[in-house]
Every structure is written in C-alpha cells, then in structure tokens.
Curated annotation (Swiss-Prot):
Cofactor binding annotation: Binds 1 [2Fe-2S] cluster.
Location(s), subcellular: Cytoplasm
Gene Ontology CC terms: cytoplasm
Positions bound to [2Fe-2S] cluster: C3, C6, C18, C25
NCBIfam families the record matches: hybrid_clust (TIGR01703), PRK05290.1 (NF003658)
Record-given protein name: Hydroxylamine reductase
SUPFAM superfamilies for this protein: Prismane protein-like
Catalytic activity: A + NH4(+) + H2O = hydroxylamine + AH2 + H(+)
EC top class, as a word: oxidoreductase
EC number: 1.7.99.1
Species of origin: Proteus mirabilis (strain HI4320)
GO function terms (MF aspect): 2 iron, 2 sulfur cluster binding; hydroxylamine reductase activity; metal ion binding; peroxidase activity
Length: 550
C-alpha cells in the first residue's frame, strides 16, 4: 500500500504516505492496491478512447464510465474491494470492445501505451492485489526523485477531483465532448509516467483550466434543473417525526428522494455538502425538506449514531459506520461503497423509505436555530454593484473567502478563530464543508448585507470566481487587485483541483492549510510561492495583519 492523496495521510521522518495494512481513512491495503490497478486500467482505456477518436469513434458510455470509475478512488468514497475490481473488469470489457471497433475502421492503428493492454491476472482478490503492486504509485519514486513524483501526484489527484465534478455534471445530463477528450488526453498521458518537470507543471495548470469549464458545466446543470439558488433560512435542529438524512453532493438523488417520500410523513434532512440544496427553488419547494443535521463529515460516526433514521450517502465522504453501530441504517449510491453496507443500484429508494417508517424518528422538535444559505452565482452577481458602492464609500474594507474541506486535525480551529477575528467592516464568503467550522455563529450584517455569505458546495467556487471576475471588470482592474483574499482549507482531491483552477486563472496570494499536501516537497512549495504567492496559514492574527495592511 502507498497512498498520499489526502490531508490526514501518515507523515513520518522516513517518508510520507499510508503504507501499512490500513490507511488513516480506514481504507485497507487491499482496497488501496486494487484502486491503483483500477487507475492503471483506466489510463489504458483513455489511451484507446483517444485512438478511437482519431477515426471518429466517440463512445459516450466510455466517456461517462471512465471518470465515474476514477471517482471511486477518491478519499472516503469506495472502500469495497469487490466493487473496485468490478470497475476494473468493466473498464477492460469496454476497452476491448472499443479496440475491436477502432481496428475495424483502421487496422493500422497502434496504441503504444504501457497500460493499453492490461488484463486481470486471476479472479481472487489476493492474486489481483499482487498484480496491483506492479502499479503502485511510488514504484519509481526513488529513481525519479521526490520533486518529480510530487508533481505527478499533483496532476493525478487534480485529475481525480476533475473526474468527480465530471460525474456530478453528467448525472445532471451535461456533456461536452471537448472536455471528455481533454480528460482522456490527461489520463492517458499520466499513464506514461511523465518525467518532464515543466510539462508536469504546465499540465497541472491545464487540468485546472479544464476543471473551470467542468464547474461551469456543473453550474449550468444544477441551475437548469433546480433554478438559481436564493438566500433562505435553514433550521439546523431536529423536527418531530420520521426522518431520513442525505449526505454527499448529488442534488438529483435528493430530488428523487424528496419525490419518493412526499406525503409519507417522513422529514428529509441534508448533511454536509448537501446543505446548499435548500437554496434551490425546485428543491426547497418540498415542505418535508425540513432542515440540516450535523456538522463536518469527520463527525459523522457520533452524529449518525444519534440520527433516528436511515442515512443515504450519495458521494464522498463516508467513513466506517461500524464504529457508531449504524451500519444497518446507512445506504450507499453510485460510486460510494463500504463492505456490508446496503447499496442502492437503481433509482428506487422504497426499501430505505420503509426502513425510515419502521424507525422511531425524532420524538420532539427542538427550538429552531436558523442559518442562511443560498448565495449562489446569480445572487452574488446581483449584489456586485452594492459591493462596489460599499467599497467606494469605505464602508466595506475587505472580502474574505474562507472555505474548503473540513477534517479532524486540531489545527483546523484556525478557521473558526479567523472568522471570528475578521473585522466588522469585512464580508466573509464561505463554501464547502469547511464552513461548518463557523457557519452557526452570528456574524451580523454590514449595511444590510449578511456578513457571512454561504456560496454553496465546493464546486461553487465557480460562483465566487465569477463574482471576482465581474467585480474586476466593473472596477477596471485585475482580480488580484481586488480587496479580496482567499484562505482555503484542503482535505482531498476536489480541493486540489479547485486550487489548480484558481492558480491556472492567475489568482495569487492564496493562503492554504491546515498543512501542505504531503506529496508537495519544499522545493515544489517554493515554486508555487514564487509563481503564485501561495503560502501556508500561520496564525489568524498574523495573517489578518498581513492581509489588511497590504
């Protein structure tokens, strides 16, 4: 096992990365190794997808399958070895079919790619794990050096994040052939073990640029399906009655759940990154979408244990449900998996709904505690002139974007302390699950504007970017000249690709934490600092002083 993709990976004096029987996330060495094998097979599949495109064969089934299967290898998504092998088998089946059709059109085509012909060597997990070790990500790390290895990981993990957003957009019916072709190019290229530092840096930025277009596609899918989010108050306390909790990012799953539970006397609660769903007109119209439950994903074992109904995981993040003894009440969808947990393959939630009806639900309603969400792209753009007026009148000094992934590391209290310390003449935008560090606090208003603006899910960084671009255009300056600072928290691969997106767009002086990715060496961090001014967080007091005195 070698895995260094998330913020909680092991860090030791002799090297970084989870490398024993089980990773810090709970992923076994078996599952981790099999995910490496799956990635290698997918790299070969992308090589054939490119070859097929050269003879005008575009297979939409492969285009949708490839990033979805890749998504299953992200942190806290799929811990089920059998399902990982299932994805690998399906990838090989699709590859062989595509290969036959491609060669039938042009028998002279050759795909000289090191992973284009991988076959599974055995049917049992032990044999496949042994084969998988040939594709471990650190096999040539000692030969190529830590810097080059780190850049490979930056590209790989960034592309994983982009693949996740591609799947979210695809679920909503969004498809762009140019994006899928570009994805296959990057995936196939990674499979060749690239060894040029400049090429790796350039392609890291290219992956970021591609992801900007993917986020635009996802924004289009969400707003076309559910309308533009508008500000709404959300109750974060339980309401008496039967209950289902839905977590993850997939708004379509939430819509289907709301449709199938309507009129059945079941209250639906959002968890984690589902919180922004309350702002969408076509979702908040359901009266039994009663509120949000819980906090950051890392607290789910204690919070889900107390939830008196079933829990539906639609994407990341899932962690061991056996710790809280709720394994019989948690259900997975799509790419999510945990051994022994019930998985819903189709769109019929009736079995889970029956379970909800059989459980006690909440016995009484607690006193409401309301928070506000729904400051989506259009709402932010509509407020642009107001923001400019407040800046020109010197009533608004600075805007802070404080958000990203949450996690269990104690240093993450920095973000709570920072938000509390931000002066009253400043606005705070937030997004992703990092918001749970402070989104239940009362920040008041500034000239009628809420000081805390919840922009949405992690992918809604697109909304913040579009606001910044709009403000810069109206003010006749660059984005980096705005009174705007980004203080980001990272945990996994979606955060990595959002960072690459921001850097590829030329956004500078980003603060990141709570720690640097373990795959980025001091040399690589120095390069990012020199090129982009990217820096590590220090203390709230020191960082605020530096930002506000600039």
């Amino acid at each position: 096992m070698y895995c260094v993709q998330c913020e909680q990976t092991m860090r030791t004096p002799v090297g970084n990365g989870c490398a024993y029987a089980q990773g810090m996330c709970g992923k076994t060495a078996e599952t981790s190794d099999l995910q490496d094998l799956l990635v290698a097979v997918l790299e070969g599949l992308s090589a054939w997808a490119l070859a097929a495109r050269s003879v005008d064969i575009i297979d939409h089934d492969i285009d949708s399958f490839a990033p979805r299967a890749f998504f299953s290898t992200l942190t806290n998504v799929n811990f089920d070895s059998e399902r990982i092998v299932g994805y690998a088998k399906e990838a090989i089946y699709l590859r062989e079919s595509l290969k036959s059709r491609t060669l039938a059109k042009n028998a002279a085509i050759q795909v000289a790619h090191p992973k284009a012909e991988i076959q599974l060597e055995g049917n049992d997990l032990a044999s496949l794990q042994k084969q998988a070790q040939r594709f471990a990500l650190n096999n040539d790390k000692a030969q190529v050096g830590d810097d080059l290895h780190g850049l490979r990981m930056l590209c790989l993990y960034g592309l994983k994040g982009a693949a996740a957003y591609m799947e979210h957009a695809h679920v909503l019916g969004q498809y762009d052939d140019e994006i899928y072709a570009e994805y296959h190019r990057y995936m196939a290229w990674l499979g060749t073990d690239p060894a040029d530092m400049n090429e790796l840096l350039d392609n890291a930025m290219g992956i970021g640029q591609m992801n900007f277009r993917i986020m635009a596609l996802l924004d289009k899918g969400e707003t076309q399906a559910y309308g533009d989010p508008t500000p709404v108050s959300v109750n974060v306390r339980p309401v008496a009655g039967k209950a289902i909790l839905i977590s993850g990012h997939d708004l379509k799953d939430l819509q289907m759940l709301l449709e199938q539970t309507e009129g059945k006397g079941i209250n639906v609660y959002t968890h984690g990154e589902m919180l922004p769903a309350h702002g969408y007109p076509e979702l908040k119209k359901y009266k039994h979408l009663v509120g949000n439950y819980g906090s950051g994903w890392q607290n789910q074992q204690s919070e889900f244990a107390k939830f008196p109904g079933p829990v539906l995981m639609t994407s990341n993040c899932i962690i061991d449900p056996n710790v809280g003894n709720y394994g019989d009440r948690i259900w997975t969808r799509s790419i999510v998996g945990w051994p022994g947990v019930k998985h819903i393959k189709g769109d019929d939630f009736s079995e889970m709904i029956e379970q909800a009806l059989s459980l006690e639900g909440f016995p009484y309603s607690e006193i409401e505690h309301l928070i506000t969400v729904g400051f989506g792209r259009q709402t932010l753009l509509n407020a642009a002139d107001t923001v400019i007026d407040l800046v020109s009148q010197k009533k608004l000094r600075h805007v802070f974007l404080v958000g990203g992934c949450d996690g269990s590391r104690g240093e993450r209290s920095y973000y709570t302390d920072l938000a509390r310390a931000i002066p009253q003449d400043c606005l705070i935008m937030t997004l992703a699950c990092g918001k749970y560090r402070f989104n239940k606090l009362d920040f008041g208003t500034l000239e009628g504007l809420p000081r805390l603006l919840d922009v949405g899910q992690c992918n809604d960084a697109y909304s913040a970017i579009m606001l910044a671009v709009n403000l810069a255009e109206k003010l006749g300056c660059g984005v980096n000249d705005l009174p705007l600072s980004l203080i980001l928290s990272w945990f996994e691969q979606k955060a990595i690709v959002i960072l690459l997106t921001l850097l590829s767009l030329g956004v500078k002086n980003i603060y990141t934490g709570p720690t640097a990715p373990a795959f980025l060496t001091d040399n690589l961090l120095a390069i990012l600092n020199e090129k982009f001014g990217m820096r590590a967080i220090t203390t709230p007091e020191q960082d605020l002083q530096e930002i506000l005195s600039a």
